[in-house]
């Protein structure tokens, strides 16, 4: 039972994984192994120019260290593993910085580019940033590019050992590395791993795949003429190979799904034309079972029953993507992203023991089941809480992610379990003492919660401004984060905690309102200046002044719908304090947001919360006239306060920030987000919405947009099809991060950006 529950929890926590996971990297691309850096394709650089930039940046960081250079002539300052764009540029930059560097390459120099089809044009995107480092990069045929790079290596006397792959890596006690290759053994102070992942083609692992005429890349399509060719795969590489091979051959495509869901629009058009002209035959819902001499066995799903076909096959191209070399990386000691280790139940037991110790510390322990718990001294509670909490910390630093989950829960259970219920109603084990303990310097715990909230948003907001705005020179993101921080400081901190009281004291709101107890005594209602119903759930009851009722109706049912017409759900990413904490404090974990169809199905929950909020609000408004509604209304308010206001908006989502990204509340439980979604979807279907994200035809399927979407949208699938992304088909909140991270400038708000025509000229 416990194992089954843990598997279920594990599947939820792993739902943010992309098809290809990356190594878990700290700042400056350093892995969890000190002194071991990862750059290039493995580190998320989707195009050559960005991989080159990573190579230069990591060397700038290493060279600035006081121990960057070794006094021992037998120890290299740096060994670069991989001689592609990132690795070569890093080695050249290291040499320029006076570092003694060696580059190892298991294949040929620039092996990934070397394996491109002959004559393939290599682009120097993005155009907006110049190439960094010594490597030459401009639009060119792959043969010309490799020739220029080989010339640069020779001119700079760069020590590159081709056909010499890395076999083992061991960190020594003195901090250096012992590097074992296919041919020799070396020592180095630091390692830069730039092996990429495209050199590891994914395989079917079926009989006959090792035959001479079964390939995992297409190098020279002109070598094949008037032959039967089977292409396996449904991505753009497979379709492009099939199209070029179909010019002089009979081509069949075997694909496991029922349709091609991620094709470039132009590839889709060309494929349909080729199928209509009977130059290509499609075999959907099929899997290759075996490759034989001159034929292949394919199993086809015919809607419930399996049928085996034997198709002629002089050559087969298995083009189903590349595999991340996970086992190789783990053999080096590198930890992967979102890798769950440790014991869930051990972490849960230690978290409970910590709370139990705090129960004894609070002095409110009561006897239970005949056990004299009330007699346990407070200092024993201190020892128990310190020991259990310390064990969680120690386990966390040893790589136990469940321990970090336990610590995160303890922190936010304490904050919200004390603040939200209020004095005397705190959650166990803080009942009767927690609120007072957190009320400092004459201010209640609620005030210090607001201080903590604003501080977290400010500190991490400044980091986010640098990451997305300043470093990328992106004015949209700079203004977005300035907006979030401004709303938090002004409307969610200064006004409710200071300015409202001053407005009453100095009668800035007029003498009548200042002397109205219903207005003056409810400073908490000032949150409703920006928070609309149903996010500000109590807008219309508990005896509000008329001005609050009027403003609540105007904000919720006039201003918000008009705002949504032009901006979709940007309220979540530009204004809201809940979304603000997610966009700032939660930003560093945005790539862990749940993805896939299952995670989208979970989005029904905020509709349920919206319906419940509407039902309770209606009952509260009618209870004075309908006696039967009084008890259900009271129960509904209490239930909403407990489950929505404390657990769903507070404890659970913030606990899960480091594990499921920052938008758990906004995406799955926020009733206002769902209300805006319904408005925006209706506007889109009516054809009057002004909110959408468009795509041009330059998408390279790097998946950076999908990876960084905090609400788990498969943005790349929209970009590939050049399909507008709006709220009729997605829960997009308009943060624009997908637009910012795209290396090809594919995405934009509104109409697609104009394309610059690039002509391939040959010397």
Regions found by a protein language model. Name each.
Residues 337-731, 736-763:
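Non-ligating segments of multi-cofactor redox enzymes
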Residues 171-176, 182-270, 335, 343:
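Predominantly flavin-linked oxidoreductase catalytic cores and closely associated redox partners
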Residues 12-66, 171-177, 182-211:
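Glycine/serine-rich phosphate-binding loop and adjoining beta1-alpha1 elements at the start
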Residues 104-143:
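Active-site-adjacent segment of FAD-dependent monooxygenases/related oxidoreductases
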Residues 27-106, 217-262, 305, 326-331, ...:
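Rossmann-like dinucleotide/flavin-binding elements
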Residues 36-38, 79-81, 104, 185-198, ...:
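Short hydrophobic core segments
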Residues 2-20, 191, 195-217, 307, ...:
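Glycine-rich beta-alpha-beta "Rossmann" dinucleotide-binding loop(s) and their flanking helix/strand
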Residues 6-7, 120-126, 139-188, 247-338:
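A Rossmann-like FAD-binding core segment of flavoenzymes
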């Amino acid at each position: 039972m416990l194992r089954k529950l843990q598997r279920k929890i594990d599947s939820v926590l792993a739902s943010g994984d992309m098809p290809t996971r990356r190594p878990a990297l700290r700042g400056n691309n350093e892995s969890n192994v000190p002194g071991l850096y990862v750059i290039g394709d493995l580190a998320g650089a989707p195009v050559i120019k960005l991989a080159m930039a990573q190579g230069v940046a990591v060397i700038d960081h290493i060279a600035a260290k006081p121990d960057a250079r070794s006094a021992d002539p037998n120890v290299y300052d740096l060994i670069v593993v991989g001689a592609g764009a990132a690795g070569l540029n890093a080695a050249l930059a290291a040499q320029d910085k006076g570092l003694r560097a060696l580059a190892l390459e298991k294949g040929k120099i620039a092996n990934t580019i070397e394996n491109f089809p002959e004559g393939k044009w290599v682009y120097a995107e993005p155009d907006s940033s110049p190439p960094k480092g010594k490597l030459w990069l401009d639009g060119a045929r792959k043969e010309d590019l490799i020739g220029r790079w080989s010339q640069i290596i020779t001119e700079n006397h760069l020590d590159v050992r081709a056909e010499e792959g890395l076999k083992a890596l061991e960190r020594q006690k003195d901090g250096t590395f012992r590097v074992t290759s296919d041919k020799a053994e070396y020592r180095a102070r630091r390692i830069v791993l730039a092996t990429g992942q495209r050199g590891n083609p994914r395989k079917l692992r079926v009989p006959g795949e090792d035959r001479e005429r079964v390939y995992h890349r297409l190098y020279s399509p002109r070598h094949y003429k008037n032959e039967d060719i089977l292409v396996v795969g449904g991505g753009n590489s497979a379709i492009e190979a099939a199209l070029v091979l179909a010019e002089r051959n009979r081509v069949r495509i075997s694909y496991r799904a029922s349709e091609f869901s991620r094709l470039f629009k132009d590839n889709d058009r060309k494929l349909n034309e080729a199928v209509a002209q009977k130059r290509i035959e499609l075999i959907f819902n099929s899997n290759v079972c075996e490759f034989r001499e001159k034929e292949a066995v394919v199993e086809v799903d015919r809607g419930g029953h399996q049928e085996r076909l034997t198709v002629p096959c002089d050559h087969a191209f298995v083009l189903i993507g590349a595999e991340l070399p996970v086992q190789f990386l783990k053999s080096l000691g590198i930890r992967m992203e979102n890798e769950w280790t440790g014991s869930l139940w051990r972490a849960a037991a230690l978290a409970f023991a910590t709370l139990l110790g705090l129960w004894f510390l609070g002095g409110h322990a009561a006897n239970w089941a005949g056990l004299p718990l009330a007699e346990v001294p407070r200092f024993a509670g201190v020892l128990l809480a310190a020991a259990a909490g310390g064990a969680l910390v120690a386990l966390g630093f040893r790589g136990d992610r469940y321990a970090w989950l336990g610590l995160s829960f303890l922190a936010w259970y304490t904050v919200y379990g004390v603040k939200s219920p209020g004095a005397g109603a705190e959650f166990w084990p803080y009942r009767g003492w927690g609120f007072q303990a957190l009320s400092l310097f004459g201010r209640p715990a609620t005030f210090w919660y607001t201080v903590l909230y604003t501080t977290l948003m400010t500190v991490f907001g400044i980091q986010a401004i640098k990451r997305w705005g300043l470093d990328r020179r992106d004015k949209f993101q700079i203004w977005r984060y300035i907006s979030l921080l401004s709303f938090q400081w002004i409307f969610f901190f200064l006004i409710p905690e200071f300015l409202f009281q001053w407005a009453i004291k100095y009668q800035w709101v007029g003498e009548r309102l200042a002397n109205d107890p219903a207005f003056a005594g409810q400073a908490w209602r000032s949150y409703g200046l920006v928070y609309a119903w149903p996010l500000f759930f109590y807008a219309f009851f508990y005896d509000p002044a008329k001005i609050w009722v009027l403003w609540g109706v105007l904000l919720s049912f006039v201003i918000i719908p008009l705002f949504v017409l032009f901006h979709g759900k940007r309220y979540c990413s530009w204004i809201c304090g809940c979304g603000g904490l997610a966009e700032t404090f939660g930003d560093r974990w945005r790539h862990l947001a749940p993805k896939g169809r299952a995670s989208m199905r979970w989005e029904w929950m905020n509709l349920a919360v919206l319906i419940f909020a509407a039902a309770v609000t209606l009952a509260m408004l009618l209870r004075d006239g309908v006696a039967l509604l009084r008890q259900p209304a009271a129960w509904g308010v209490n239930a909403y306060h407990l489950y929505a206001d404390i657990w769903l908006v507070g404890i659970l989502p913030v606990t899960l920030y480091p594990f499921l990204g920052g938008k758990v509340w906004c995406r799955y439980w926020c009733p206002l987000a769902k209300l805006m979604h319904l408005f925006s979807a209706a506007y889109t279907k009516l054809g009057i919405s002004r909110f959408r994200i468009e795509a041009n035809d330059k998408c390279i399927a790097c998946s950076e947009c999908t990876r960084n979407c905090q609400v788990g949208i498969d943005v790349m699938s929209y970009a590939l099809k050049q399909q507008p992304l709006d709220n009729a088909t997605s829960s997009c909140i308009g943060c624009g991060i997908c637009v910012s991270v795209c290396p090809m400038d594919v995405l934009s708000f509104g109409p697609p950006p104009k394309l610059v025509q690039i002509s391939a000229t040959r010397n």
